[in-house]
From Swiss-Prot:
Transmembrane segments: none annotated. GO terms for biological process: proteolysis. The active site is at E310 (proton donor/acceptor). This is Carboxypeptidase O. It comes from Homo sapiens (Human). CDD domains: M14_CPO. N-glycosylated. The lineage of its organism: Eukaryota, Metazoa, Chordata, Craniata, Vertebrata. It comes from the Eukaryota. Detected in enterocytes of the ileum.
Length: 374
């Protein structure tokens, strides 16, 4: 048992036998819990272990203070249980308009390796942006928006009560069942396939499209920035897959071949690190049919590149990936994500530059034609 879980159990907040989490006890004893958790600083923060939400909140605050010239913490919304949702914006000052890369982790509560990767990604960018020419190049024209834990209520619940909880924690059917699958709640052919209207089910799609406060917060923000977002990345586990749209239909997005090409290159970069094999394809083709996913919704609103990463492993440990695998998982995934970002960057700015060259050539041709008439 983890030290924090031992503490919660001994304090009576983790009730044995699956009876649940006593919120009143948690509130009254929070101060005791805080004192019982070993003190840490950003310098000693380990990226090789899983962290409870309280430590992730503190990490976000401290990292935005230490690297304040590059990263800022921003309020996004609140969860059903009124926990604040924050994202980190990594940005270098620039006189030019910049495009956006979005990354979220932890939409499914039990997939702990996903928030671990979001933290790893932020750490790697911040520690290396001055010395790594590739990262410097990306930051000249791109801002990174990172939401380390989307499903905060569910994530906390996996630490206190049920390690394999998937959904959010909103009550339904007069409190007889809890939670919505937030990755079935987006407005992308909502609840048409691979989702359930029964609130007892793992894939309960909610009471309507974007019915949950967590999905509303994300959808509202993404909608407001959609014209500037080049790439939408949502990190999951497990299965070792890079998934493209769509899950709700066998039809493909207009740039499907290009997305597969970028995804396959990323899978190759990932494999080169430790030999881990990833498959690339649309969700409907290589995983299963599903509707209401954030990936499909992002593509439907016009974001050109949208991917789901299903991280390690392929089923041996499943959602309970050992901490010994955090570092290699994050290192190889970092290679894949940087490959995607390099390709997206090159495709956008190459086409933009090509467009400017074509326009300039046409203008020059018109000027020459006009001068010949004089």
């Amino acid at each position: 048992m983890k030290p924090l879980l031992e503490t919660l159990y001994l304090l009576g907040m983790l009730v044995p036998g699956g009876l649940g989490y006593d919120r009143s006890l948690a509130q009254h004893r929070q101060e005791i819990v805080d004192k019982s958790v070993s003190p840490w600083s950003l310098e000693t923060y380990s990226y090789n272990i899983y962290h409870p939400m309280g430590e992730i909140y503190e990490w976000m605050r401290e990292i935005s203070e230490k690297y304040k010239e590059v990263v800022t913490q921003h309020f996004l919304g609140v969860t059903y249980e009124t926990h604040p949702m924050y994202y980190l914006k990594i940005s270098q000052p620039s006189g030019n308009p910049k495009k956006i890369i979005w990354m979220d982790c932890g939409i499914h509560a039990r997939e702990w390796i996903a928030p671990a990767f979001c933290q790893w990604f932020v750490k790697e960018i911040l520690q290396n942006h001055k010395d790594n020419s590739s990262i410097r190049k990306l930051l000249r024209n791109l801002d990174f928006y990172v939401l380390p834990v989307l499903n905060i209520d569910g994530y906390i619940y996996t630490w206190t009560t049920d390690r394999l909880w998937r959904k959010s924690r909103s009550p339904h059917n007069n409190g007889t069942c809890f939670g919505t699958d937030l990755n079935r709640n987006f407005n992308a052919s909502w609840c048409s396939i691979g989702a359930s209207r029964n609130c007892q089910d793992q894939t309960f799609c909610g009471t309507g499209p974007v019915s949950e406060p967590e999905t509303k917060a994300v959808a509202s923000f993404i909608e407001s920035k959609k014209d500037d977002i080049l790439c939408f990345l949502t990190m999951h586990s497990y299965g070792q897959l890079i998934l493209t749209p769509y899950g709700y239909t066998k039809n493909k997005s207009s740039n499907h071949p290009e997305m597969i090409q970028v995804g396959q290159k990323a899978a190759n970069a990932l494999k080169a690190k430790y030999g881990t094999n990833y498959r690339v394809g649309s969700s409907a083709d290589i995983l299963y049919a599903s509707s209401g996913s954030s990936r499909d919704w992002a593509r439907d609103i016009g974001i050109p590149f949208s991917y789901t990463f299903e991280l390690r492993d392929s089923g041996t440990y499943g959602f309970v990936l050992p901490e010994a695998q955090i570092q290699p998982t994050c290192e190889e995934t970092m290679e894949a994500v940087l490959s995607v970002l390099d390709d997206v960057y090159a495709k956008h700015w190459h086409s933009d530059s090509a467009g400017r060259v074509t326009s300039a050539t046409m203008l020059l041709g018109l000027l020459v034609s006009c001068m010949s008439l004089l």
